[in-house]
């Protein structure tokens, strides 16, 4: 750890005790974090959410962005009355807007809870089951791969090398008869 040095009563040179340098696990001293070239970590659970741009990663640009013109269209030559068209547009837009709000008010929190639990389980399984299983499999497969490699080099390589030498002398001539 970085820090100053001090001399004790007997004249021995020591570094500053770790406890005086700040928390050894998570430095809360900004100068210490700067000295150690650590970047500041922000908690993902306390960040502010953007109430204007609610899809900053554009997950739903091509899927759910449905307007009146995307669903209902009258081709040239088959037009309804202008008043009907305007009323249909307003009805579609307002109904979609308020029904979405109603559904999100009723089911939004329970669905967020369900998806939160689901992704917590998936994350837990990935961290505590999948990755350790893959690592242990890779460790175990190394032993098998060494035995397999010895088997291949001992038995199969000479066999296929012999086959190669036998079949290397075969010549095929093709002639076209008229």
UniProtKB/Swiss-Prot annotation:
Fetch the InterPro entries from UniProt.
Caveolin, Caveolin_CS
User: Residue ranges of region Interacts with SPRY1, SPRY2, SPRY3 and SPRY4?
Assistant: 131-142, 167-178
Single Gene Ontology BP term? negative regulation of pinocytosis
Give positions of region: Required for homooligomerization. Answer: 2-94
Q: What does the UniProt PTM comment say about this protein?
A: Phosphorylated at Tyr-14 by ABL1 in response to oxidative stress.
The record's intramembrane ranges read: 105-125
Q: Which residues carry this modification: N6-acetyllysine?
A: 5
Annotated keywords: Acetylation, Cell membrane, Golgi apparatus, Isopeptide bond, Lipoprotein, Membrane, Palmitate, Phosphoprotein, Ubl conjugation
Q: Which family does it belong to?
A: Belongs to the caveolin family.
What is the name of this protein? Caveolin-1
């Amino acid at each position: 750890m970085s820090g100053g040095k001090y001399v004790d009563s007997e004249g021995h040179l020591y570094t500053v005790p770790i406890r005086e340098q700040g928390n050894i696990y998570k430095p809360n001293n900004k100068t210490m974090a700067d000295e150690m070239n650590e970047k500041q970590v922000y908690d993902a659970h306390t960040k502010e959410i953007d109430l204007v741009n609610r899809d900053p990663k554009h997950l739903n640009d091509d899927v759910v962005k449905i307007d009146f013109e995307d669903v209902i269209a009258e081709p040239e030559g088959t037009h309804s009355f202008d008043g009907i068209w305007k009323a249909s547009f307003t009805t579609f837009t307002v109904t979609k807007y308020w029904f979405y709000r109603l559904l999100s008010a009723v089911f939004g929190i329970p669905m967020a809870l369900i998806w939160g639990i689901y992704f917590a389980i998936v994350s837990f399984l990935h961290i505590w089951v999948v990755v350790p299983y893959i690592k242990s499999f890779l460790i175990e497969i190394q032993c098998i791969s060494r035995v397999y490699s010895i088997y291949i080099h001992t038995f199969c390589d000479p066999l296929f090398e012999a086959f190669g030498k036998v079949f290397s002398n075969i010549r095929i001539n093709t002639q076209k008869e008229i």
